[in-house]
């Protein structure tokens, strides 16, 4: 069984664990990295529960924030927010995420599957991964805006590469590669 839990990233002069936004999970937070420029990574190991809103953390710290919810080291839910550009959600390791959610992916489905899902209505599901998360191209564009608010100039290409990659072998590696491509925590 792989890792389940949150990796929380933000920038502040105080420890993120001391913010009101993370008050509900404060006792379970463990610091993983804290840099001189204020960027921090905190961990909250948990297979359930909710750590709170990244929008709230971004507003409180007046800086971009994001979390990755790692699911069994196979995929990651990514929620990001910045004071000016707002919040967005996507995922890393899309094929594994589709399996967890029981959602198809538009690109990978055969004609019969897509038609069946439409005809089946709610009973057949019919939802795709893009109904839950921004598709990789849109997420890469939002990530560029997020990085700009963090003071970094980045290109969509390297972000898109991470957003369309599969775990190698752990989804956590994708998360930290994504942070590297954002210019936040270089590898």
Predicted regions and their residues:
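Intrinsically disordered, low-complexity segments enriched in small/polar residues
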Residues: 1-4, 42, 67, 174
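Charged/polar, solvent-exposed surface patches and flexible loops
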Residues: 20-24, 56-59, 145, 161, ...
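Short, extreme N-terminal segment that most often corresponds to the first beta-strand
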Residues: 1-36
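Long, compositionally biased intrinsically disordered terminal regions
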Residues: 94-108, 116-187
């Amino acid at each position: 069984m792989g890792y389940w839990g949150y990796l929380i990233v933000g920038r502040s002069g105080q420890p993120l664990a001391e913010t009101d936004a993370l008050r509900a999970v404060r006792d379970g937070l463990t610091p993983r990295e804290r840099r001189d420029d204020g960027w921090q990574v905190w961990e909250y190991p948990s297979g359930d529960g909710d750590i709170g809103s990244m929008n709230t953390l971004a507003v409180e710290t007046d800086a971009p924030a994001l979390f990755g919810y790692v699911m069994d080291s196979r995929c990651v839910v990514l929620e990001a927010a910045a004071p000016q550009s707002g919040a967005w959600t996507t995922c890393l390791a899309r094929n594994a995420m589709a399996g967890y959610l029981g959602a198809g992916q538009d690109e990978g489905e055969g004609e019969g599957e897509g038609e069946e899902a439409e005809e089946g209505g709610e009973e057949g599901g019919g939802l795709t991964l893009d109904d839950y998360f921004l598709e990789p191209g849109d997420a890469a564009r939002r990530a560029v805006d997020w990085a700009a608010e963090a003071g970094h100039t980045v290109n969509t290409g390297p972000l898109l590469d991470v957003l369309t990659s599969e775990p190698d072998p752990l989804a956590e590696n994708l998360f930290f590669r994504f942070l590297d491509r954002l210019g936040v925590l270089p590898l």
